[in-house]
């Protein structure tokens, strides 16, 4: 098993590139199943274990998948008759595998998908997915760890109001409705940039989707969708992680590919703390010096502060003066990294859904383990400024969402290595 070893204290400087977005490429790959004519080519695809997993899922469904890692490109040909079942072997590894259900229902009228896996942060229920499919005319039942869906009369447009703006449910319902007969209106939808990217992709394939990025999405179903070439948007969570790497080390970094409009809530908090940010068409420059101001953070659905940046922001707040409170409203079990920060001498207490940070912590190197994907990055960030040596284990989480993070940080001046232990 690998571990990352960091000797803290180096100020990071230089330029770094952002990969394609993990949270965009996974739904776009599954949406490629919608194309019954021609093949799709996706570019700017990050080399992640989750991409490998979803490619394997698509292959089991009888799609032909070619992954060129050297060119960060994936070709998907889904023109053959698709298999209806996404097996537990792959789906159990990653929650996003549930996203094949919408395309399978749209193409075949029936699907069997194992209940999903992924990071252990909260229950993340699938009720909203099921609600949407049922509204579109599918019969759903759960049996022996599988979700069985059947729309014997085909999917039909519907008016759907989500109880919560679930990202996955929004994506799944969009894909199912894109080939349904008639018009669908989905209210209280997720508004993340990744939703917009998915809608843009389906529209490029011949779909008719409007309103992505707003509270209400309207879909006019079409009879057929076609394979196209599509570039995945930059990863705003990786970009945010790298901005914090610059801020936490009081460094000077240009993050090429960072898009201001995709991370407005994070940028607002960084500026409130006294971090200097400069915006260019090609990316964002981050510089920081001296003491940072205390701020409170509350995670919310987009455009609120992203839960996927909560643990990285916690690492930064450990280096700021004063009293700080982080409130997690999206997932109920996303403070598992607090115990690991405490091993590094962090002064944090947790009360329910809030974590309280008192003063500036004198972080010390320790052996810590990643508890989920973003916590892995956060512990590495803390290690960049901790006194002494930090060792981060359980890197399987990190590899699900970051490409060569240690290498990028090393190129900026960090004393960091990935070693086989």
From Swiss-Prot:
Keywords: Cell cycle, Cell division, Cell shape, Cell wall biogenesis/degradation, Cytoplasm, Peptidoglycan synthesis, Pyruvate, Transferase
A GO cellular component annotation in the UniProt record: cytoplasm
SUPFAM superfamilies xref list: EPT/RTPC-like (SSF55205)
2-(S-cysteinyl)pyruvic acid O-phosphothioketal modification, residue list: 119
BP terms from Gene Ontology: cell division; cell wall organization; peptidoglycan biosynthetic process; regulation of cell shape; UDP-N-acetylgalactosamine biosynthetic process
One Pfam family per UniProt: EPSP_synthase
GO molecular function, one term: UDP-N-acetylglucosamine 1-carboxyvinyltransferase activity
UniProt entry tagged with the keyword Transferase: yes
Pathway(s) per entry: Cell wall biogenesis; peptidoglycan biosynthesis
Residues reported to bind phosphoenolpyruvate: 22-23
Record-linked PANTHER family: UDP-N-ACETYLGLUCOSAMINE 1-CARBOXYVINYLTRANSFERASE
Protein name, entry field: UDP-N-acetylglucosamine 1-carboxyvinyltransferase 1
């Amino acid at each position: 098993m690998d571990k990352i070893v960091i000797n803290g204290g180096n100020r990071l400087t230089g330029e770094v590139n952002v990969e394609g977005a993990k949270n965009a490429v996974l739904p776009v790959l599954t949406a490629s199943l919608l194309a019954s004519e021609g093949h799709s080519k996706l570019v700017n695809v990050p080399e992640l274990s989750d991409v490998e997993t979803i490619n394997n899922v698509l292959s089991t469904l009888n799609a032909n998948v070619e992954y060129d890692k050297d060119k960060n490109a994936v070709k998907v040909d889904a023109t053959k008759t698709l298999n209806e079942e996404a097996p537990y072997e792959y789906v159990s590894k990653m929650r996003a595998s549930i996203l094949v259900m919408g395309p399978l229902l749209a193409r075949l009228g029936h699907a069997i998908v194992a209940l999903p896996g992924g990071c252990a942060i909260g229950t993340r229920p699938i009720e909203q997915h099921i609600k949407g499919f049922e509204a579109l005319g599918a019969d759903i039942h759960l049996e022996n760890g599988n979700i069985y869906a059947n729309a014997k009369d085909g999917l039909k447009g519907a008016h759907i109001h989500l109880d919560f703006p679930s990202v996955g449910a929004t994506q799944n319902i969009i894909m199912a409705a894109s080939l349904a007969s008639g018009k669908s209106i989905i209210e209280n939808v997720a508004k993340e940039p990744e939703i917009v990217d998915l809608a843009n992709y389906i529209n490029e394939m011949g779909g008719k989707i409007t309103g992505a990025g707003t509270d209400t999405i309207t879909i006019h179903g079409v009879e057929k969708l076609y394979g196209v070439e599509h570039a995945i948007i930059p990863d705003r969570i990786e970009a945010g992680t790298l901005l914090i790497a610059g801020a936490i080390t009081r460094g000077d970094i240009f993050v090429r590919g960072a898009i201001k409009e995709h991370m407005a809530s994070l940028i607002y908090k960084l500026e409130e703390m006294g971090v200097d940010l400069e915006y260019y068409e090609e990316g964002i420059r981050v510089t920081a010096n001296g003491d940072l101001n205390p701020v409170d953070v509350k995670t919310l659905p987009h455009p609120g502060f992203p839960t996927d940046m909560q643990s990285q922001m916690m690492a930064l707040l450990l280096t700021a003066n004063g009293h700080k409170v982080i409130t997690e409203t999206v997932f109920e079990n996303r403070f598992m990294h607090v115990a690991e920060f405490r091993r590094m001498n962090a002064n944090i207490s947790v009360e329910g859904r809030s974590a309280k940070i008192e003063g500036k912590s004198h972080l010390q190197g320790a052996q810590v383990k990643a508890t989920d994907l973003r916590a892995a990055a956060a512990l590495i960030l803390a290690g960049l400024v901790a006194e002494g040596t930090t060792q981060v284990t359980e890197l399987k989480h990190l590899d699900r969402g970051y490409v060569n993070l240690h290498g990028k940080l090393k190129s900026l001046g960090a004393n960091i290595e990935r070693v086989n232990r």
